Amino acid sequence: MTGADPPSGTFHLFITSGMSDNHNREGYTPGKPWLAVALCVLALVSIAACRGKGAGAEQEDEAASHRFPDTLRVATLYSPTSYFLYRDEPMGYDYALLTQMAADKGVAVDLVVAPSLQKMVEMLDSGKVDLLAYEIPVTAEYRKKVHPCGPENLTYQVLVQPKKDKEKLITDVTELVGEDIYVEARSKYQYRLENLNEELGGGINIHVIDRDTLLTEDLISMVSDEQIPLTVVDNDIARINKTYYKDLDISMPLSFPQQSRWGVAPDHAWLADSIDRWFAQETPRRRQAELLKRYFELSKIDMGTFTLDLSKGHVSPFDHFFRESGRENGIDWRLMAAQGYHESRFNPDRVSWAGARGIMQIMPRTARAYNLDASRLAEPESNISTAAKIMRDLDRSLAKKVADPKERIKFVLAAYNGGIGHVYDAIALAAKYGKNPQVWNGNVEQALLMKANPEYYSDPVCRNGYFRGRETVAYVRGVMNFYETLKKKVT
């Protein structure tokens, strides 16, 4: 997770089939809004080898006359569902499906992250890309320039409300009369509520919040915290956010479903046919189900329990490993112990939704960068020792940006938890928007939260796109608070 000073201008980041172990190494340069990702280049796979039965003769003739490109040019957008960077590694539901399809077909992928949906469609229309790996609404407007293909998704708006006894839940639109509902200004949610309110004859109290003040994710969090009673979002966004909160109900739809799919150019129906044939196979269908569970169902917050007892001067059963690794790398072992508690509750066998493993929740690719086989991440000593080296390297890299060693600890923790690329972005945003780029509390932490807003993560100073910073900010605060407690009670 270490990195060099982020360079200016636009660049392309290429990643091989092994996903180069750049992460957490000196000199790693984080990604950018226009990002190219090169995947494995294996044998060229023809359409004939992938074709199934049942297509019309004309479609089969057309498919047989084309070969799947050896390099598939693909565009997508930063979003919590399609593509994002987490701990400096590319992730996302659509991204994962794309990489699996490319590996199965034995082709390379040149992936570009476009700045907007309109620009992405323009890239397809001008022939700059072959495929849009993003859920494009299947409407008459888009069908003029986009031929649908790939995974089918049905999106509809839902009411987000606190989970209550069944008799207290709102289960019918008529029950919205008299209720207060908060939504983003000038959003489709506002327009849907206004139409629904008109259909019901009025009575819904619609509170419109400007995006500069709060985002959809903020409103969902406020419902969970009971700061506001209700909000409205798309079901896929609701499902992802529900994995961060245990006390939400998202079961009530407020609109008709809208189909969305990937897309190719209208004159590339043969490519769409090949992609659809791949998705129709049993193995891809099973993988798709696994990815749906990973991104939309698995809890992001459930770490189990661990009973703390500091009365005897001990924090965990692994204190001797924390002490030794801390001493070898110049880190207070109590800081690392505080991390271990917040990362996994000291559970050596924990595996997160993102694949991070062990007490210190290290990503397998990061482990390999430090010459540790992923199979050994469940070993407490190896896991803690590697985490200490990561923290050491992060501190060295961030010393270029944050001079005060004590203040830098918070930046290092944020980089460990969310990725140094996003921390670099937050530092740049803080400097640009009048905050102190060398102070975490109230400054860079606020800039990190801004990276959930398209207006800011699309800013030229940001190189790593969308980031849900809420959990990382809470992580830094939680670790630092526990660390201060340990300094008073444990030597």
Residues covered by each model-derived region:
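A ligand-binding cleft/hinge motif common to bilobed small-molecule-binding domains
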Residues: 118, 133-145, 194-195, 221-256, ...
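Bilobed "Venus flytrap"/periplasmic-binding protein-like clamshell domains
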Residues: 73-82, 86-103, 137, 158-214, ...
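Extended ligand-binding regions for polar small-molecule ligands
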Residues: 92-104, 163-190, 256-300, 313-316, ...
